[in-house]
């Protein structure tokens, strides 16, 4: 497992193919021109069709503040009458952007790669809806799967959570809440470059302060919008899952981080904390990649390889 002691030693250069893609289609989570502008830039990113053959249904479910949009994907191997494992997917976007459409391709990748039903959750966004709105919506969706999942063919003995960036944070929180609430049982958590600690002393924040895609200025803005009135120097565990007093008895985890991501060491540290608590965990550092690399799978070979590695880990647990 990667260690915080050696993450910056002899780090290879950013993947050259990724650099060419970033030059051709520039994208940065800059907040200089306001929240609506960055939301629109994310929506406007060009996206290649991914597994268009999948059966997909949009469904509104009951939430704590009104209907929550979800999108359900069935893997091609899932016959109408068979039960399949189910993955609750929480999209990234710094808690302030992203929706069912921005992460449609990612969810299709997960449905095929994990051979599982995927339920994508359109949780409420900050700053209009600061913490804990996203968590409460995610938990409502988790309870919906536990209570109604069989209606869509889900095997309730094989529920996993997954998410990228802010969604990885949410997935980690939901895994903890499910343990604390006595269910539903979560069998695996796939966390793509999450933020779990809100620890400003982690070395990667300085090392990758001006990294492509996501820089520390954007992280600070997103964190403040999400936190609302909460002191970011002492966030509660349901907001920063790495600060939970008890990390034992959580589901096995795969934590993916990237060498050129300010959040790299956060994911590594959370992996160390889980391992110390006796939780089976694998942490993979894609040294030549950047935050958000799952979105470049299928375009950048190194991103494809790193993404497939996490999906294989998920698939093995769900179909072991």
UniProtKB/Swiss-Prot annotation:
Function text: Esterase that can hydrolyze short-chain esters with the carbon chain containing 2 to 12 carbon atoms. In vitro, pNP-butyrate is the preferred substrate.
Family recorded in the similarity comment: Belongs to the 'GDXG' lipolytic enzyme family.
Coiled coil: none
Domain of life: Bacteria
Activity regulation, per record: Inhibited by ionic detergents SDS (anions) and CTAB (cationic). Strongly inhibited by Zn(2+).
Name of encoding gene: lipI
Activity versus pH, per record: Optimum pH is 8.0. Stable between pH 6.0 to 9.0.
Any one Gene Ontology molecular-function term assigned to this protein's record: acetylesterase activity
Protein name: Esterase LipI
Disulfide bonding pattern of the chain: none
EC class name: hydrolase
Active-site residue numbers: 165, 261, 291
Catalysed reaction, written as an equation: a fatty acid ester + H2O = an aliphatic alcohol + a fatty acid + H(+); a butanoate ester + H2O = an aliphatic alcohol + butanoate + H(+); an octanoate ester + H2O = an aliphatic alcohol + octanoate + H(+); decanoate ester + H2O = decanoate + an aliphatic alcohol + H(+)
Keywords assigned: Hydrolase
Enzyme Commission code: 3.1.1.-
Record field: temperature dependence: Optimum temperature is 37 degrees Celsius.
Pfam name, any one: Abhydrolase_3
């Amino acid at each position: 497992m990667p260690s915080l002691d050696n993450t910056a030693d002899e780090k290879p250069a950013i993947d050259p193919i990724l650099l060419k893609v970033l030059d051709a289609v520039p994208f940065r989570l800059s907040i200089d021109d306001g929240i609506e502008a960055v939301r629109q830039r994310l929506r406007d990113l060009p996206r290649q069709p991914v597994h268009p053959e999948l059966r997909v249904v949009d469904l509104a479910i009951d939430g704590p503040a009104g209907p929550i949009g979800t999108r359900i994907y069935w893997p091609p191997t899932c016959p109408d009458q068979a039960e399949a494992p189910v993955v609750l997917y929480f999209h990234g976007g710094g808690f302030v952007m992203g929706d069912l459409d921005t992460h449609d391709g990612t969810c299709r990748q997960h449905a095929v790669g994990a051979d599982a039903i995927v339920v994508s959750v359109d949780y409420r966004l900050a700053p209009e809806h600061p913490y804990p709105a996203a968590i409460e919506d995610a938990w409502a969706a988790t309870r919906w799967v536990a209570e109604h999942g069989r209606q869509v063919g889900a095997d309730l003995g094989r529920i996993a959570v997954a998410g990228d960036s802010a969604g990885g944070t949410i997935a980690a929180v939901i895994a903890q809440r499910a343990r604390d609430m006595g269910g539903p049982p979560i069998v695996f958590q796939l966390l793509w470059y999450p933020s779990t600690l809100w620890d400003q002393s982690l070395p990667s924040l300085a090392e990758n302060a001006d990294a492509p895609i996501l820089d520390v200025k954007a992280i600070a803005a997103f964190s403040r919008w999400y936190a609302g009135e909460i002191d970011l120097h002492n966030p509660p565990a349901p907001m920063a899952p790495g600060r939970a007093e008890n990390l034992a008895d959580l589901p096995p985890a795969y934590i993916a981080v990237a060498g050129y991501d300010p959040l790299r060491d956060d994911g590594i540290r959370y992996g160390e904390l889980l391992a110390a608590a006796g939780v089976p965990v694998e942490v993979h550092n894609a040294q030549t990649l950047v935050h958000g690399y799952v979105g470049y799978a299928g375009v950048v070979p190194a991103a494809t390889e790193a993404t497939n590695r996490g999906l294989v880990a998920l698939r093995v647990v769900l179909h072991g």
